[in-house]
Regions:
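M16/MPP (pitrilysin/insulinase) zinc-metallopeptidase core fold and M16-derived inactive scaffolds
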Residues: 43-110, 173-174
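An aromatic/glycine/proline-enriched structural segment found at the starts
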Residues: 1-16, 167, 171-175, 180, ...
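Acidic/histidine-enriched alpha-helical segments
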Residues: 84-87, 127-146, 212, 232-245
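M16/insulysin-pitrilysin zinc metalloprotease superfamily fold
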Residues: 72-76, 106-140
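Buried hydrophobic packing residues in well-ordered domains
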Residues: 28, 46, 64-66, 86, ...
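Scaffold signal of the M16-like zinc-metallopeptidase fold and its non-catalytic homologs
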Residues: 1-3, 72, 116, 148-200, ...
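Extracytoplasmic
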Residues: 17-20, 26, 39-43, 62, ...
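N- or domain-start disorder-to-order transition segments that initiate the globular core
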Residues: 2-41
Length: 255
């Protein structure tokens, strides 16, 4: 039997991560843009300086609820209308809260970038945080917690953070809050956290895709550039200390 010759690997080619173009909008929003010809789906990432250690005492999880509520209605659209507008653009919008801050992610075909950027700016500029939507998100989060505690991997990760870091550090506690802290979250708490920490002057937007035929500076100025907010000094990062002494921890998980 004759086999096809084994393919040979080609010579490795040098590669370097493309350096983005840096800039800023008039409202203080830092911009990083990267033109990638052929990448017809544009990705936009906005990092908000709203870290988990900024959450008020006893309200662990409020950053997560705020992130989830950003697209649940604005001053111009209800939650259902906003979702429908995103769908018409063929866009997806997600938000996630983590220790460094809240990350808002948009993906959209380049041909519909203008409308999708307007919706993103709307969600950042004027989220409504309706009482009923916040209550629903809190209820959803409370439903998630028992499943996380029942998952051995998630339970082990929580215990690891608790063992490694001092109790006063936010990173020692569950990122999305506990049942006790999440129950305290309401629309007023979400609005207060948003007002205190979400503003363009301390945020960064990263835009990557094929910008051929697009006036990207004008698009960004007409959308994200209309987002306003007070200036603020960068939030100091807490010193992180940890106990990395070797030990074995047994976690009881009844059931």
């Amino acid at each position: 039997m004759t086999f096809h010759p084994q393919p040979q690997a080609g010579s490795p080619k040098p590669w370097a991560f493309p350096a983005p173009e840096r800039g800023a909008l008039g409202n203080g929003l830092t911009l990083l843009t990267s033109h990638r010809p052929g990448q017809q789906v544009v990705a936009v990432e906005v990092l908000l300086a709203a870290p988990l250690d900024a959450e008020p005492e006893g309200l662990d999880g409020v950053a997560t609820i705020m992130a989830r509520a950003l697209s649940e209605g604005t001053d111009q659209h209800t939650a259902e209308e906003f979702a429908a507008e995103l769908e018409r653009c063929g866009a997806t919008l997600d938000a996630h809260a983590d220790h460094p801050g809240v990350r808002v992610s948009l993906e959209v075909p380049a041909s519909r970038l203008d409308r999708a950027l307007a919706l993103l700016a709307e969600a950042l500029r004027a989220p409504a945080f309706p009482e009923d939507e916040v209550k629903r998100l809190v209820a959803n989060r409370l439903d998630e917690i028992p499943h996380e505690l029942a998952n051995p991997g998630r339970r082990a990760a929580m215990e690891l953070s608790k063992e490694l870091f001092p109790a006063e550090l936010r990173c020692s506690r569950p990122r999305q809050g506990t049942e006790e802290t999440v129950r305290r979250i309401d629309a007023a708490a979400v609005r207060a956290f948003y007002t205190a920490h979400v503003r363009p002057a301390t945020s960064t937007a990263v835009v990557v895709g094929d910008f051929t035929g697009l006036d990207l500076p004008a698009l960004l100025d007409d959308t994200l550039g209309r987002w306003t907010g007070a200036s603020a000094a960068p939030r100091p990062r807490p010193a992180i200390t940890g106990n990395d002494e070797a030990r074995v921890v047994i976690v009881d998980r009844p059931g």
